[in-house]
Amino acid sequence: MKFATTLVTGLVSLASLASARITGITLPTKIGVNEVFNVTIKSENYIQSIADIAFAFGVIQPQYADAGSLGMYLVGESFLGPTFSNQISDFIVPVGPIPDNVPKGETLFNAALFSLLGSRFAPTTFIWNATVTLQNTTDYSQTITSTIPLTFDYYPG
């Protein structure tokens, strides 16, 4: 009985050390202007603690896109904080609406995540993007996932 109690206590303390990181985004390939739509935030187990602070979302026509920018139109933001930081399961955030003055057709959707990494809380920004089509209504029947971020790190020396 003592072994079982020790084992359970050890597993509980290991579970409290569980950490996760955000690994990408999934969103509809066809997004309606003037509509709020859902973006799934992908996550997985990770070896260290990460304090995920907030997401910002933007769109831009591909021919005007610059690496590292959100685009010409800021279309949403989401504070994550302790509720969604270090969460091992995927979760959904509402985004939008994308204004109707954004040209319909092929558009680059960008998501920037500001996080603090490790025991020294090193600030880092991750940016994921996906090419989507802007149209009259959102269609959830097809989605696109982006899992390779552009990363901007600052590590104190």
Where would I find each of the regions flagged by the language model?
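Extracytoplasmic/periplasmic copper-protein system
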Residues: 121-157
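Internal, hydrophobic beta-strand segments that form the core of beta-sheet-rich folds
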Residues: 90-136
